[in-house]
């Protein structure tokens, strides 16, 4: 089995050669502990329960998911999907995520030149785009959203009603659409928010909020 083989490789200090072989069937599955994929590597599915995941620059993985831990995707890496329950997700520059980026309790940051084919979503935590492109929309319940300068979002933006028992804050999520950014599709708000839109940004129909215009870099 692949997992057994990987354990033997690790035991003999040969994991680096396994990564270098470029085997996209090489799955890594752990319960306790972090996963680090070196630069310029090709692997399959990455999964851990208690630990973070880091994927090196210019590497490729099929997917990465963790329960308690963050995920870092270094510059130039590619992957199908990223998912965590308790932890943040940071996607570096010029990365490609074919499908989705999802968190429950954690922030999500997409840096310059990154492209996500599907949606980007969380429940609690900020979502920030820095000159990035998202093809399947943005969604949160309690987090702030910043669609930074020169970012593009297709599929709209949605802030859901917060029905969680433990979340008692009356703070309104802050939504900022930055200079020369584009959000195509409906901006739908199921709870009160503060919505700020640059006078050079382009957005679709707004439901449930009153946009406040601003000029300059930030409101």
Regions found by a protein language model. Name each.
Residues 1-219:
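Intrinsically disordered, low-complexity terminal regions
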